Protein backbone atom coordinates (compact mmCIF):
# COMPACT_ATOMS: atom_id res chain seq x y z
CA UNK A 1 0.00 0.00 0.00
CA UNK A 2 1.42 3.40 -0.94
CA UNK A 3 0.92 6.72 0.81
CA UNK A 4 0.35 10.18 -0.66
CA UNK A 5 0.93 13.28 1.44
CA UNK A 6 0.17 16.90 0.56
CA UNK A 7 0.10 20.15 2.50
CA UNK A 8 -1.91 23.31 1.89
CA UNK A 9 0.04 26.12 3.52
CA UNK A 10 1.41 28.44 0.85
CA UNK A 11 0.20 31.64 -0.77
CA UNK A 12 -1.21 29.77 -3.75
CA UNK A 13 -2.65 26.84 -1.82
CA UNK A 14 -4.59 28.22 1.14
CA UNK A 15 -6.75 31.26 1.75
CA UNK A 16 -10.16 32.70 2.49
CA UNK A 17 -12.60 35.38 1.39
CA UNK A 18 -16.02 36.45 2.50
CA UNK A 19 -18.83 34.69 0.63
CA UNK A 20 -19.85 37.87 -1.19
CA UNK A 21 -16.35 39.24 -1.80
CA UNK A 22 -13.46 38.69 -4.22
CA UNK A 23 -10.90 40.10 -1.77
CA UNK A 24 -8.78 37.11 -0.71
CA UNK A 25 -6.36 36.64 2.19
CA UNK A 26 -3.84 33.92 1.32
CA UNK A 27 -0.95 31.99 2.80
CA UNK A 28 -0.35 30.11 6.03
CA UNK A 29 -0.52 33.32 8.07
CA UNK A 30 -4.17 33.64 7.05
CA UNK A 31 -5.21 30.03 6.59
CA UNK A 32 -8.59 28.75 5.49
CA UNK A 33 -11.52 29.57 7.72
CA UNK A 34 -15.29 29.40 7.87
CA UNK A 35 -17.96 31.30 9.76
CA UNK A 36 -18.15 35.00 10.50
CA UNK A 37 -16.49 37.65 12.63
CA UNK A 38 -18.56 40.80 13.05
CA UNK A 39 -20.51 39.57 10.05
CA UNK A 40 -24.24 39.97 10.43
CA UNK A 41 -25.12 38.93 6.87
CA UNK A 42 -24.59 35.69 4.95
CA UNK A 43 -22.41 37.56 2.42
CA UNK A 44 -19.84 38.10 5.20
CA UNK A 45 -19.47 34.42 6.13
CA UNK A 46 -15.95 33.16 5.32
CA UNK A 47 -15.10 30.68 2.57
CA UNK A 48 -11.80 28.84 3.10
CA UNK A 49 -9.98 27.07 0.26
CA UNK A 50 -7.25 24.44 0.60
CA UNK A 51 -5.44 23.13 -2.49
CA UNK A 52 -3.39 19.95 -2.13
CA UNK A 53 -0.98 20.23 -5.07
CA UNK A 54 -0.47 16.98 -6.91
CA UNK A 55 -3.36 15.18 -5.21
CA UNK A 56 -5.61 15.15 -8.27
CA UNK A 57 -3.09 13.37 -10.50
CA UNK A 58 -1.71 11.12 -7.76
CA UNK A 59 -5.09 9.91 -6.47
CA UNK A 60 -7.20 9.76 -9.63
CA UNK A 61 -8.46 6.23 -10.12
CA UNK A 62 -6.70 4.93 -6.99
CA UNK A 63 -8.43 3.02 -4.20
CA UNK A 64 -8.27 5.23 -1.10
CA UNK A 65 -8.56 3.32 2.17
CA UNK A 66 -7.96 6.12 4.66
CA UNK A 67 -7.65 9.91 4.79
CA UNK A 68 -5.79 11.66 7.61
CA UNK A 69 -6.34 15.38 8.08
CA UNK A 70 -3.85 17.22 10.28
CA UNK A 71 -5.51 20.54 11.06
CA UNK A 72 -3.70 23.44 12.75
CA UNK A 73 -6.12 25.90 14.35
CA UNK A 74 -5.60 29.40 15.65
CA UNK A 75 -7.05 30.62 18.92
CA UNK A 76 -9.69 32.68 17.12
CA UNK A 77 -13.37 32.03 17.38
CA UNK A 78 -15.98 31.38 19.97
CA UNK A 79 -13.91 29.23 22.31
CA UNK A 80 -12.20 25.94 22.90
CA UNK A 81 -15.22 23.65 23.04
CA UNK A 82 -16.17 21.46 20.10
CA UNK A 83 -16.67 23.03 16.69
CA UNK A 84 -17.97 21.66 13.41
CA UNK A 85 -16.04 22.09 10.15
CA UNK A 86 -18.18 21.86 7.02
CA UNK A 87 -16.33 20.60 3.94
CA UNK A 88 -17.43 21.22 0.35
CA UNK A 89 -16.24 20.29 -3.10
CA UNK A 90 -14.35 23.13 -4.79
CA UNK A 91 -15.70 24.61 -8.01
CA UNK A 92 -12.09 25.45 -8.94
CA UNK A 93 -9.13 23.13 -8.39
CA UNK A 94 -6.94 26.13 -7.61
CA UNK A 95 -7.07 29.11 -5.28
CA UNK A 96 -8.86 31.36 -7.76
CA UNK A 97 -8.54 34.82 -6.23
CA UNK A 98 -10.31 36.43 -9.18
CA UNK A 99 -13.75 35.25 -8.08
CA UNK A 100 -16.03 35.81 -5.10
CA UNK A 101 -15.86 33.35 -2.26
CA UNK A 102 -19.30 32.07 -3.24
CA UNK A 103 -17.97 30.93 -6.63
CA UNK A 104 -15.61 28.46 -4.94
CA UNK A 105 -18.31 26.64 -2.94
CA UNK A 106 -19.46 23.35 -4.46
CA UNK A 107 -21.64 20.54 -3.13
CA UNK A 108 -21.34 19.63 0.55
CA UNK A 109 -19.06 16.68 1.33
CA UNK A 110 -19.87 16.51 5.04
CA UNK A 111 -18.84 17.69 8.48
CA UNK A 112 -16.12 16.98 11.01
CA UNK A 113 -16.56 17.70 14.72
CA UNK A 114 -13.58 18.31 16.98
CA UNK A 115 -11.71 20.65 19.29
CA UNK A 116 -10.51 23.13 16.68
CA UNK A 117 -9.05 25.91 18.83
CA UNK A 118 -5.40 26.90 19.33
CA UNK A 119 -4.04 23.44 18.54
CA UNK A 120 -3.07 20.92 15.90
CA UNK A 121 -5.34 17.91 15.73
CA UNK A 122 -5.36 14.90 13.41
CA UNK A 123 -8.59 13.26 12.33
CA UNK A 124 -8.54 9.94 10.51
CA UNK A 125 -11.36 9.15 8.11
CA UNK A 126 -12.10 5.59 6.99
CA UNK A 127 -15.02 3.16 6.67
CA UNK A 128 -15.42 2.91 10.44
CA UNK A 129 -14.42 6.39 11.64
CA UNK A 130 -16.19 9.44 10.19
CA UNK A 131 -17.54 7.07 7.55
CA UNK A 132 -19.94 9.44 5.75
CA UNK A 133 -17.32 12.17 5.28
CA UNK A 134 -14.74 9.55 4.30
CA UNK A 135 -17.01 8.09 1.62
CA UNK A 136 -17.70 11.51 0.10
CA UNK A 137 -14.06 12.68 0.20
CA UNK A 138 -12.83 9.33 -1.10
CA UNK A 139 -15.03 9.54 -4.19
CA UNK A 140 -14.10 13.20 -4.70
CA UNK A 141 -10.33 12.58 -4.55
CA UNK A 142 -10.52 9.34 -6.57
CA UNK A 143 -12.20 11.41 -9.32
CA UNK A 144 -9.01 13.49 -9.56
CA UNK A 145 -9.87 16.54 -7.46
CA UNK A 146 -7.32 18.29 -5.27
CA UNK A 147 -9.07 21.23 -3.53
CA UNK A 148 -11.40 21.41 -0.53
CA UNK A 149 -13.59 24.28 0.65
CA UNK A 150 -14.63 25.14 4.21
CA UNK A 151 -17.95 26.99 4.38
CA UNK A 152 -20.86 26.90 6.81
CA UNK A 153 -22.85 30.05 6.01
CA UNK A 154 -22.93 31.20 9.63
CA UNK A 155 -23.39 34.83 10.59
CA UNK A 156 -22.44 36.54 13.84
CA UNK A 157 -23.33 39.52 15.95
CA UNK A 158 -21.82 42.88 15.05
CA UNK A 159 -19.23 42.41 17.81
CA UNK A 160 -18.34 38.72 17.91
CA UNK A 161 -17.66 35.38 16.25
CA UNK A 162 -20.08 32.81 14.90
CA UNK A 163 -20.34 29.46 16.73
CA UNK A 164 -18.04 27.48 14.42
CA UNK A 165 -15.57 30.19 13.31
Feature map (PLM): residue ranges:
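Flexible, small-residue-rich N-terminal segments that precede or flank a structured functional core
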Residues: 1-56, 85, 89-93, 155-159
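A short beta-strand element within beta-rich, extracytoplasmic domains
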Residues: 52, 62-76
Amino acid sequence: MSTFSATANGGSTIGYAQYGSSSWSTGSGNGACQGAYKGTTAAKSRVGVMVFNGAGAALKGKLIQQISLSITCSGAGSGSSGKVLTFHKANYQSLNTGVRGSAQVGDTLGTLTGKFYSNTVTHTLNVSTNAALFSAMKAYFEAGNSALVLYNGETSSSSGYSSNY
